[in-house]
């Protein structure tokens, strides 16, 4: 165990010490927010992360052992042991790893430790795309035409496509990031696509259930950031446009979403809040929609803090991690919907900086030592990272080096500032 003196807690009667069950930039982000609130922090680390930035910044740090994520950050018993040894009274899961695992949330609740996230029952309901679609319908959110049950075989796909038209898309019910997703252009392609989607879903998510829905040919990916409290209040913070993707993975995000038809952003926000309330949601969450031809449809709900939460923070001056912690401590939301709406100003853009090799246009992960990292700065520029010069990027973890986040009074100013900052990186 590594340690330094902890700061006094401003929430001493509720939360005295938070363990961050994660690594990299999100662990650093949570540590900094907790430090500003006067709450002691605990890091956990694999053997490869012993000297990482999040370990250096935390008040205490506990070894999980192992190198891979399976041996360390998603080794349930190792993480639970660190919680016991540290005496932490709350756990922030970050994103990825245990962040959307209701069984983990239940396990730490059984220890008398607060999970800084939504109730496990809400995670259960939003954890697969089929049950989340049903929850959205209960909340009055429009959904893309599709099945509300798992597809039992290729015939279900063919019947749907023949009724609703081609192309259709087969999706992994328990997945995301484009894994287990297959676009089917005609009935002749169904058998191969169904088998491929199931294989990929099982390999990446441990479950092979799939469902089918109408395929929108050129949709935009627009999402709503929201936060709810344990008293039943819920507000939406901002919209975000995450349409700039590669291999179904986000690269550039903006807030607010631009060039939406009149009233669409507000309607999305209201639909997101209704969907969250339908499952008794509290904490930070994101409802994703697809938008095309003036219509929007519920896609899924992410029951965690998103990588791109920063752009919503930049246009509202709301610290979403602080809000997460305060909600977990039982506090009511500090702002009403009208106050949140009035706080929005300007435009923000986030660009993900990844360690990749662009050779032959493949952009494959490129682990190794960072010889020099000089973050850009200047007015309206923020750089969130879990690395410093000399740190090592491991092949076993995500290759995200950092997030360049820029604010401007208009979208045009934000774009110009982003270009300037990228040139300086």
Question: Which residues does each PLM region occupy?
Answer:
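Active-site "cap" helix and flanking loop/linker of ATP-utilizing ligase/carboxylase catalytic domains
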Residues: 254, 260-294, 302-359, 423
């Amino acid at each position: 165990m590594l340690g330094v003196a902890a700061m006094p807690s401003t929430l001493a009667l509720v939360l005295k010490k938070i363990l961050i069950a994660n690594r990299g930039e999100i662990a650093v982000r949570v540590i900094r927010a907790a430090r500003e609130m006067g709450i002691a922090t605990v890091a956990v680390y694999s053997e490869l992360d012993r000297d990482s930035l999040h370990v250096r910044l935390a008040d205490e740090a506990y070894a999980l052992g192992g190198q891979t994520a399976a041996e360390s950050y998603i080794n349930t018993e190792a993480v639970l042991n660190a919680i016991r040894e540290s005496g932490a009274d709350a756990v922030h899961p970050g994103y990825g790893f245990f962040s959307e695992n209701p069984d983990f949330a239940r396990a730490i609740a059984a220890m008398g430790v607060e999970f800084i996230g939504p109730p496990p029952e809400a995670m259960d309901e939003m954890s697969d795309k089929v049950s989340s679609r049903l929850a959205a319908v209960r909340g009055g959110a429009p959904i893309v035409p599709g099945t509300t049950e798992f597809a039992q075989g290729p015939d279900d796909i063919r019947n749907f496509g023949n009724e609703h038209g081609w192309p259709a898309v087969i999706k992994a019910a328990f997945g995301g990031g484009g894994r287990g997703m297959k676009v089917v252009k005609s009935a002749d392609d169904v058998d191969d696509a169904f088998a491929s989607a199931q294989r990929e879903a099982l390999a990446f998510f441990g479950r092979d259930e799939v469902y089918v829905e109408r395929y929108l040919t050129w949709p935009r990916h627009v999402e709503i950031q929201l936060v709810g409290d344990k008293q039943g209040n819920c507000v939406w913070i901002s919209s975000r446009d995450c349409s700039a993707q590669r291999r179904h993975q986000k690269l550039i995000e903006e807030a607010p979403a631009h060039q939406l038809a009149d009233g669409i952003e507000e309607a999305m926000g209201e639909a997101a809040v209704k969907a969250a309330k339908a499952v008794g949601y509290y904490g930070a969450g994101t409802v994703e929609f697809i938008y095309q031809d003036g219509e929007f449809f519920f896609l899924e709900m992410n029951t965690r803090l998103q990588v791109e939460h920063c752009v919503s923070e930049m246009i509202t001056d709301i610290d979403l991690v602080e809000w997460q912690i305060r909600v977990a401590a039982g506090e009511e939301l500090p702002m009403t919907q009208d106050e949140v709406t009035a706080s929005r100003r300007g435009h923000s853009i986030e660009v993900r900086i990844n360690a990749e090799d662009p050779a032959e246009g493949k952009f494959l992960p490129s682990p190794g030592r960072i010889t020099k990292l000089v973050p850009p700065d200047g007015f309206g520029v923020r750089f969130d990272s879990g690395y410093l010069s000399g740190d090592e990027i491991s092949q076993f973890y995500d290759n995200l080096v950092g997030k360049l986040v820029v604010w401007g009074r208009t979208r045009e100013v934000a774009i110009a500032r982003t270009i300037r900052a990228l040139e300086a990186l």
